[in-house]
């Protein structure tokens, strides 16, 4: 996620970091060079009686813009839902530890439970990003729990099971009444719902055929556009073609980023920062001495 301070409108025009321009610049350069080639080809295909007009490109451009808008809205809806789910995880984690800490007198046992919660957040983050988990989870889980988690097809769900087992032990030991156990178990169910929601987004992409047809149409439009522009614009064709192509290609590229909000690209969710905030909150609630530093944006204003 790009987290920038408010900028002057003129300065924002020239922003590079965080823009999709860095990803599509090579494609725009090819469009520029192809437009120059079309200028030299103009006498040849005019001599053959081939004539392109702007009318069909105007109609096609409007249609592409509408469908790009639909796709971007679908991608942004996934992004917003993903952010809401991680917000719910933060709320449920704080509430669960608060209820446990104010109920159970054993601080060492509560500390173990807090570390399970932190491990769950990091495990979910790394699962969604397909990152290795052993080194990070080893800081929070006991050896036997770590082995159980790593052996599972759903590590985050296994941690939830361990948390449920921990609550069951407290209930059997008489530390929790039936009513409190049900209340705390409901919190675990809330966290489980977050896990299922994130998995739904991560493993259900926007239909490939829809993405493919829009992607093809955008690039065919950008390839054919110089032939229609060159008749009237001549040597200005490369500049206008690149400007129009930038609009369509950048929207197509942005939609690809928003489709998977859990990645590490510029416009994805800052899961590292969210997990860091959860960890800091839970450790401070448990009066821990060692608190990690807050994750801040880098020099390019990117928060991962």
From Swiss-Prot:
InterPro entries: Bestrophin-like, YneE/VCCN1/2-like. It is found in: Cell membrane. Keywords: Cell membrane, Ion transport, Membrane, Transmembrane, Transmembrane helix, Transport. The chain crosses the membrane at residues 28-48, 50-70, 194-214, 220-240. It holds the Pfam family Bestrophin. GO terms for cellular component: plasma membrane. One of its GO terms (molecular function) is chloride channel activity. Belongs to the anion channel-forming bestrophin (TC 1.A.46) family. This is Voltage-dependent anion channel-forming protein YneE. It comes from Escherichia coli O157:H7. The lineage of its organism: Bacteria, Pseudomonadati, Pseudomonadota, Gammaproteobacteria, Enterobacterales. The gene is yneE.
